[in-house]
Amino acid sequence: MLEDKNKNLLFNIAAHTGSLIAVIIYFKKEIFSIINNIPLLQNIIIATTPVVIFGFMIKVLNINLFLQDIKIVAYATIFFSIILYFCDKVSVKIKFNKNISNRNALYIGLAQVLALIPGTSRSGITISCARYLGFSRLDSAKFSFLISIPTLFAATVLGIGEVALNFDRDLIILLLVGFSFSLIVSLLSIKVFLSFVEKHSLTIFVIIRLILGFLLLFYLAN
């Protein structure tokens, strides 16, 4: 049982690492520009800090098992889909010029904390918040991806710490496959998603998540 748990955790780490590298590769220009743009770096830190603090608290208090209740997943999926729909209706008021305000960064960071609730999409809730604040869909998505870098990095490091003592060398090939698959899929997903939101609304994602949420409720009812 413990061995299976370690295998799953290792595979999740490989997948997280692949996603992390994909975001870094795709946004390498923005990342390198941070060297000359301290305000952007500051805002990324501000937006990331809340989820790190609350994530640590959830782990210490051991309430993550309670949050994994499938009913919570279903209701969160439906509820935050509705939030995304209405937030996406807000007109663009703010131009993201690589220097959003600290207050807006904090709001988006607090919204990201809600992603700790299973069924809540991290990108979905942060984009919802950014759209509500008046950012365009494309700018909202870009900032959401940028603040995912510290989060993915932290998740990877914590995961490695948990399985380091029980690492199985026989799983290296499987982990490389998982990493490579995650990297390729993530790169394609980022490119397709950003191209889509630049020209279209987020309604299709709302519909997909609503369907998934109601399917889960239907499954529970039967």
Model features per residue range: what roles?
Residues 1-222:
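Multi-pass membrane proteins that catalyze or facilitate reactions on polyprenyl-/lipid-phosphate substrates
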